[in-house]
Amino acid sequence: MNNNNFDMEKFKKLAAIVSEGEIDEMLDETTVGAASTLPCAEVVVTVTGIIVKATTGFDWCPTGACTHSCRF
């Protein structure tokens, strides 16, 4: 398998595109773990049987993107 080739069709089957507003509605400050004091905290929430995974910093970032450019 060549890891340099990104297969968008496979990605679409594995991932869901969610707007920032939808994430804000699902995960607000009342959600356990959403207000972590860690600079980057991984939060996993199950919504109707689907696991939604995101990385938090000062704002929502894609999982694994807890970087300087994502946090600020």
UniProtKB/Swiss-Prot annotation:
Contains LL-lanthionine and DL-beta-methyllanthionine, when coepressed in E.coli with the flavecin synthetase FlvM2. One of its GO terms (biological process) is killing of cells of another organism. GO terms for molecular function: signaling receptor binding. It is found in: Secreted. GO terms for cellular component: extracellular region. There is a cross-link at T55-C61, T63-C66, T67-C70 (Beta-methyllanthionine (Thr-Cys)). Keywords: Antibiotic, Antimicrobial, Bacteriocin, Lantibiotic, Secreted, Thioether bond. This is Lantibiotic Flvbeta.g. The lineage of its organism: Bacteria, Bacillati, Bacillota, Clostridia, Eubacteriales. The gene is FlvA2.g.
